[in-house]
Amino acid sequence: MNLRMTLATAVRVLGQLRHDHRSVALILVVPALLLTAVYFLFENEALPPGFPRTFDRVGLMMLAIFPFVMMFLVTSITMLRERTSGTLERLLTTPIHKADLLFGYAVAFSIMAALQSLVATAVAYWIFGLDIKGSPGLVVLIAVINAVLGVALGLLCSAFARTEFQAVQFMPVVVVPQILLCGLFVARENMNDALNGISGVLPLTFSVEALKEIAGNTEATAAMWQDAAVMGGIVVGVLVLASLTLGRQTR
């Protein structure tokens, strides 16, 4: 890998995103707006004294889910534009290595993912008073890893789409099952054996489990670090798969 080439690619992609106001809004503003909607859904709930708010549980999980979904969408569509416009094919004819190109894209989108997670977490804590035992810094860490996972999956799936509509069609296959089975709606121990088994290998499940550990403990636990490490390993694995499809032409 050539660090200079990687950074040059990242700077180019960030420059393109800077002029794409809709994508910037989708990344930075929309998750905060959706989190606002979640907060007001539970604003008037009647709870016994000392009983935790539903928002403290659901809103925390949304800090993992929203960045994941948004970064998957933005990355897959942006990467598809690079392919269909011929930009990617032209770059691959230059001396730049595939790994430099791929990680350049990943670095650029990951920077946006980190900004997105910081904005959403700040809104949750300092506007809506998210109340959990763990540190906000750990929440941001898991949110960022999850957003980068969305980036990696977006890079991979973009290779198998010919239009932006087809890129969006990957959501019901890649994103929605993870949201349904991650333990947000039904505790994993209450699922049947088949669904519980599937849930156990889905990346989003590990992020939800990590956030549960943060919510219930004042200090980082071994289980939380283990879940974070698994997520990091999945991100690396998906990026390797994405690099194998980088030269695939979209016609």
Label for each model-derived stretch:
Residues 62-69, 110, 144, 148, ...:
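Hydrophobic transmembrane alpha-helices
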Residues 39-40, 77, 121, 125, ...:
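Transmembrane alpha-helix boundary and packing residues in multipass membrane permease domains
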Residues 184-228:
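Terminal transmembrane helical anchor/hairpin motif
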Residues 37-46, 161-201:
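Transmembrane helix segments
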Residues 134, 150-151, 166-169, 182, ...:
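Extended hydrophobic-aromatic, low-complexity segments
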Residues 138-161, 179-182, 232-241:
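Hydrophobic alpha-helical transmembrane segments of polytopic membrane proteins
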Residues 90-98, 160:
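Short helix-to-coil transition segments within interhelical loops
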Residues 2-88, 99-117, 126-139, 143, ...:
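Transmembrane helix-boundary elements of multi-pass transport/secretion proteins
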